[in-house]
Curated annotation (Swiss-Prot):
Lineage, broadest ranks: Eukaryota, Metazoa, Chordata, Craniata, Vertebrata
GO cellular component: plasma membrane
Site residues by UniProt (Cleavage): 564-565
UniProt family annotation: Belongs to the G-protein coupled receptor 2 family. Adhesion G-protein coupled receptor (ADGR) subfamily.
Disulfide bonds: 532-559, 547-561, 655-731
Organism: Mus musculus (Mouse)
Boundaries of every GAIN-B domain copy: 434-577
Record domain SEA: where: 147-255
Name of the featured protein: Adhesion G-protein coupled receptor F1
Keywords, sorted A to Z: Cell membrane, Disulfide bond, G-protein coupled receptor, Glycoprotein, Membrane, Receptor, Signal, Transducer, Transmembrane, Transmembrane helix
């Protein structure tokens, strides 16, 4: 049995004069054209013609090879002088069971790493020989065949970019192409295996030239040889062109390579012209995933003509003129299905201008005109255009809002006698209803249903109760809905949120209502925390003013609003709806109490600061306590500032400053807690060692403020240049796949918590022994009391409560972890005041004496005021020795290590 095989044979042919037969035979599968000049009069065109030759067995294949070697005479079917300069067999295929299996001939390979038809073929590279398998059913056109090894190169010519370089038929294009190719051929002609070089592209950025070298050796060998000749190639090019130094590059693998944009290395950015029939240009950037369009202004030439026509009739516009413009616009878009970024912007601009002129001249629109407008909107709201909308909104931030406003304005121009009307497109639904007596008894109902990506239907329902129409009747009610608007109207509110339902707009002209109900289907079931919102055209953002959530089920959300506009709902991902409100209130209440407690703590410390200096242990402890209180107070204030800043509205510098200072001062809190823990460990372990106070303080302040400042500055310097320092939704350190500066807070904080936990265990171990003189049955009780007091004091002072944050990270959906973490840390300032000040025996006694003194002074003042003759009285002054043992020695029989520990903890 014989199996039919297919052989692909490209022939390179030169022909002078007219294109003739060759151009007619070019089916677009793999045609290359190089323009040069011969004797300055006759352009020479080089074509690559692909022939598919079928053979049945290896013998026939050998016969064909011998034939191809002899094939040198011009083909008689070509008109005009012509010559075949090269014939090469590149790819062979065999058909098996409905599949086509193809492989490359010797010294050929697949470029780029796909084969034949990228849509219907799969390249297998795991075997000894890479093969291309295609389904014969879907195979249409072959694009990528086996080719010789390729090396790509690029360089810049330091000249202003002439627009004619985008026209391959121009003399300027021929001048640069021929000159560059001749110089490169001369430089590479001695390279082993070199076959050809051709200019593939010109791009803006001075003049950026891309070229391609083809050879018969392996790709690594060809690349190495071309790199060795780089200096010679640059010298040759500079004889004719001012090549920029440092711009010459060659590479064997192009991260980005496409027919439209050519090749480039990562982060290359170029401006290229739009395709034929469009005006404008595109800016593309090479990323790891390939070429990405960053800016685009490609507009159909017909749309530009329509803009000119509108400008000409603007002063004398009529209803017929509006109808004609809208009809022409609809026809143009139907004939050109491509929705470019430039086309989107132009269509929005045209419709907006038509709407403004119609309103200014009190024009009405016909049913046909309105239908054309809805068809145009349905075309540009295609979900396939969302990527282009995203690019457009980078420069024209109000484009989507302007389109929504325009559709509402044009809808208001339809006369009431033309209603009812209903237009249902794939991406927009429109319904106009004349108001009659029925609305007074039944109210108003609007229902829509759409599908997104063949999923379950997405529904929306608007209901206005009958009592809203009792006093008077409006003429019309118009409602429209779209799913696409939810993707293109920007989300500016803080937090991760998406529009999770259709956007529904309801218009009633010259009429006000006090209540409207809207029911939305959820697009994504895993989103929670629904918020009923409307689109604020003046602020260009979603707002919840006048709207409230009535009910939520598994699949729907019911909203109630007190005004009419465009409504939808915002929802956040993967956060239990019960967590955020509870934690939010705990945080705000806790921070308020903490700030007040910390201020009170600092006031008390300042009142009795002199008394704390009499003992080095007491003094160092209070210095740590004051710095913890100051840092936590400032950190809480900056936290509140960060919580009130909207990153999407406020200048980015404000948010960056809030993130930096919040990060710095919270780190300072932890590092001062570390200093406190180290000092406590020092007093426990090195009982008889005494360090100078200045040395202690130098170490303390370097750790307490130096380390946090260094970490904060490095974090900012490393991540801010790439705009990955802060989150986009809230003012706090970022956490994303590409950048995780939040680790600069989490890692130091949890490390310090772990260190301080060890210190607490040391304290408890030191306390776990009976005091001298106590009976055995009293030992356990006394020890337990001392350990309990110490643990109560040390837990908030050393930041151990932050360890519960691990629970929130391990199980973010557990309400208990979130509430516990918020309770313990939002009230941390209050705990420091209670356990650091009120449980401090000495400070408590000083405060008590101060209050007693004030009370005595008030009583004396009253007595003096009532007596006619007063006798001088001497108030009892505070005697620090009066309370000896209550602070310094809690157990007179303990060892010196216990005395020091008691002084430091001051809990007795």
């Amino acid at each position: 049995m014989r199996i039919g095989l297919l052989w692909l044979v490209p022939l390179f042919t030169l022909t002078e004069g007219t294109d003739g037969f060759l151009q007619q035979k070019n089916d677009g599968r793999r045609t290359k054209e190089i323009v040069s000049m011969v004797e300055e009069r006759h352009p020479v065109h080089e074509y690559e013609v692909l022939l598919q030759v079928t053979y049945r067995d290896p013998e026939e294949k050998r016969e064909l090879k011998r034939f191809l070697k002899l094939l040198k005479s011009p083909s008689p079917s070509l008109r005009g002088p012509s010559k075949i300069i090269r014939v090469k067999a590149t790819t062979y295929c065999r058909s098996r069971k409905g599949f086509l299996e193809c492989a490359c001939e010797d010294s050929y390979t697949w470029f780029p790493p796909s084969c034949l038809d990228p849509q219907n073929c799969c390249l297998h590279t795991t075997g000894p020989v890479p093969s291309c398998n295609c389904s014969l059913r879907g195979l249409r056109q072959s694009i990528n065949f086996c080719e010789r090894a390729k090396v790509w190169g690029t360089f810049e010519i330091d000249e202003k970019f002439p627009e004619d370089l985008w026209n391959s038929s121009s003399d300027v294009y021929a001048h640069y192409t021929v000159g560059i190719e001749n110089q490169l051929k001369e430089a590479y002609r001695r390279v082993h295996g070199f076959e050809s070089v051709r200019v593939t592209q010109f791009r803006k950025g001075s003049i950026v030239v891309g070229y391609e070298v083809t050879g018969s050796t392996s790709p690594p060998e060809l690349l190495f040889a071309i790199e060795q000749e780089a200096e010679k190639a640059q010298e040759a090019l500079r004889r004719q062109f001012p090549v920029k130094y440092g711009s010459f590059r060659v590479f064997g693998k192009a991260p980005c390579n496409s027919i439209s944009f050519g090749f480039g290395s990562e982060n290359d950015e170029y401006t290229v012209p739009c395709s034929s029939g469009f005006t404008g240009s595109m800016t593309v950037r090479c990323q790891s995933s390939g070429w990405q369009i960053t800016r685009e202004s490609c507009v159909l030439s017909q749309l530009e003509e329509l803009k000119k026509e509108l400008r000409m009739i603007a002063g004398k516009i009529t209803e017929a003129g509006v109808a004609s413009l809208v009809q022409n616009l609809s026809t143009i878009l139907l004939q050109s299905p491509s929705t470019t970024v430039g086309n989107l912007g132009s269509v929005v601009s045209l419709l907006s201008n038509i709407s403004s002129l119609s309103l200014a001249n009190s024009l009405t629109v016909s049913n046909l005109t309105l239908m054309n407008v809805i068809n145009i909107a349905d075309h540009i709201l295609d979900s396939a255009s969302i990527t282009n909308w995203t690019i457009l909104l980078q420069d024209a931030k109000d484009a989507s809002s302007q389109l929504l406003k325009t559709l509402e304005s044009i809808s208001s121009l339809i006369p009431s006698m033309a209603l009812p009307l209903n237009f249902s497109g794939k991406f927009i639904d429109w319904k106009g209803t004349p108001v009659t007596q029925i609305q007074s008894t039944r109210g108003y109902n609007y229902q829509m249903e759409m599908r997104q990506n063949a999923s379950l239907p997405i529904r929306g329902h608007v209901f206005i109760e009958p009592d809203q129409f009792q006093k008077s009747h409006p003429k019309t009610i118009i409602s429209m809905a779209s799913l696409t608007f939810g993707d293109i109207l920007p989300i500016t509110q803080r937090g991760n949120a998406w529009v999770n339902g259709p956007v529904i707009s309801t218009l009633i002209q010259n009429y006000s209502i006090s209540e409207i109900f809207l029911n939305f289907s959820k697009i994504k079931g895993n989103l929670t925390q629904p918020r009923c919102v409307f689109w604020d055209f003046s602020q260009l953002q979603w707002s919840n003013a006048g709207c409230q959530l009535v009910n939520e089920t598994l699949d729907t959300v019911l909203c109630r609003c007190s005004h009419l506009t465009s409504f939808s709902m915002l929802m956040s991902p993967f956060v239990p709806s019960s967590v955020v409100p509870v934690v939010k209130w705990i945080t705000y209440i806790g921070l308020s109490i903490s700030i007040a407690s910390l201020i009170l703590c600092l006031i008390i410390e300042s009142l009795f600061w002199k008394q704390t200096k009499r003992s080095q242990t007491s003094y160092t402890r209070n210095i740590c306590l004051v710095n913890i209180a100051v840092s936590l107070l400032i950190a809480d204030v900056w936290f509140i500032i960060a919580a009130t800043v909207d990153p999407s509205v406020s200048p980015s510098g404000v948010c960056v400053a809030a993130v930096f200072f919040t990060h710095f001062f919270y780190l300072a809190v932890f590092f001062w807690m570390l200093v406190l823990g180290i000092l406590l460990a020092y007093r426990i372990i090195l009982v008889f060692h005494h360090m100078a106070l200045t040395t202690m303080m130098a170490i303390g302040f370097c750790l307490g403020y130096g380390c946090p400042l260094l970490i904060s500055i490095i974090t900012l310097a490393v991540t801010q240049p790439s705009n990955s320092y802060k989150r986009n939704d809230v003012c706090w350190l970022n956490w994303s796949d590409k950048s995780k500066p939040l680790l600069a807070f989490v890692v130091p904080a949890l490390t310090i918590v772990a260190v301080n936990l060890v210190v607490v265990l040391l304290v408890l171990r030191k306390l776990w022994r009976p005091a001298v003189g106590e009976r055995l049955n009293q030992d356990d009780k006394a020890t337990a009391i001392r350990m309990g007091k110490s643990l109560l004091v040390l837990t908030p002072l050393l930041g151990l409560t932050w360890g519960f944050g691990i629970g929130t990270m391990a199980n973010s959906h557990n309400l208990a972890w979130h509430v516990l973490f918020a309770l313990l840390n939002a009230f941390q300032g209050f705990f420091i005041f209670c356990f650091g000040i009120l449980l401090d025996t000495k400070l408590r006694q000083l405060l008590s004496n101060k209050l007693t003194t004030l009370s005595s002074w008030k009583q004396t003042s009253k007595r003096n005021a009532s007596d006619t003759v007063t006798q001088p009285k001497c108030l009892r002054t505070f005697n620090i020795l009066q309370h000896r043992g209550m602070y310094a020695l809690s157990h007179t029989g303990d060892s010196s290590s216990d005395i020091t520990l008691t002084q430091f903890l001051s809990t007795e």
